[in-house]
Amino acid sequence: MAVLAPLLAFLYAVPGLLRWVSQPYYLLSALLSVSFLLVRKVPPVCSVLPTQREDGNPCDFDWREVEILMFLSAIVMMKNRRSITVEQHIGNIFMFSKVANTILFFRLDLRMGLLYITLCIVFLMTCKPPLYLGPEHIKYFSDKTLEEELQSDGRVSWIIEFFANWSSECQSFAPIYAELSLKYNCAGLKFGKVDIGRYPEVSSRYSISPSPLSKQLPTLILFQGGREIFRRPQVDKKGRAVSWSFTQENVIREFNLNELYQKAKKIRKHQEDTINENEYNDSKKDQ
């Protein structure tokens, strides 16, 4: 049973994993991450490489390369303890693998190191992580439509995500936010997004720094009656975001989504009762 449960979970996730790894971004990133392994292990390429092994075998790792790879594994394990989504886990593996590959290639040959760095730069400039395109119940706003919607109906609570497409944290949070919108969206509680990369004036209006150093993206703000009630992450006196994990559990707890949802359903019921009463009165007048 202990083996069966993980196996079933893996089989259930296979279709999603196949769609995920079929993206060119992840395929090319994986290829760059294992490039030194391929060069060192695959003949006839490896046969012409220099080596520090005592047996002179150029197609196997020497002791220094093993140390670097072990150090990489330790760093990835430490970083992944704070990761939330699969994308973040894989992103950490790719990033630190490329750093290790750079060190290994430069140690092997200066020209190979320069070639590898050039390939990584070209990859970063031409390939971007795929955006989340799954189901969601989210309304996207511009700088003008956001204020209009917030002021249109004071009974509706809005949770707005301020994001930028270039932010890896925003990309990782996208499926979590979409799932929350599908679960909690109703007449009195709605979810929205604003791209402050496209509308920088919005970031100034709500005091959200778009700088990667500020760590303020994504920012979630709860609006009620057109006024800001609560936001995460909070910002310290130096303008840096206070560390906060954008997990589904944290968002539900900090924003009291269960309580907000119950109150919002009462608004929906009141609206339906009012509509039914008006229809009944109209029908009596017609008689």
Swiss-Prot record:
A motif (Di-lysine motif) lies at residues 284-287. It holds the Pfam family Thioredoxin. Residues 36-112 are extracellular. GO terms for biological process: brain development. GO terms for cellular component: endoplasmic reticulum membrane; mitochondria-associated endoplasmic reticulum membrane contact site; mitochondrial membrane. Residues 1-35 form the signal peptide. Residues 134-287 are cytoplasmic. Residues 135-269 form the Thioredoxin domain. It is found in: Endoplasmic reticulum membrane; Mitochondrion membrane. One of its GO terms (molecular function) is disulfide oxidoreductase activity. The chain crosses the membrane at residues 113-133. InterPro entries: Thioredoxin-like_sf, Thioredoxin_domain, TMX2, TMX2_thioredoxin_dom. It comes from the Eukaryota. It is a single-pass type I membrane protein. SUPFAM superfamilies: Thioredoxin-like. Keywords: Disulfide bond, Endoplasmic reticulum, Membrane, Mitochondrion, Signal, Transmembrane, Transmembrane helix. Endoplasmic reticulum and mitochondria-associated protein that probably functions as a regulator of cellular redox state and thereby regulates protein post-translational modification, protein folding and mitochondrial activity. PANTHER family: THIOREDOXIN-RELATED, THIOREDOXIN-RELATED TRANSMEMBRANE PROTEIN 2. Monomer. Homodimer; disulfide-linked. Occurs in both reduced and oxidized monomeric form. Oxidative conditions increase homodimerization. The thioredoxin domain lacks the 2 redox-active cysteines, suggesting that it lacks thioredoxin activity. The di-lysine motif confers endoplasmic reticulum localization for type I membrane proteins. This is Thioredoxin-related transmembrane protein 2. It comes from Xenopus tropicalis.
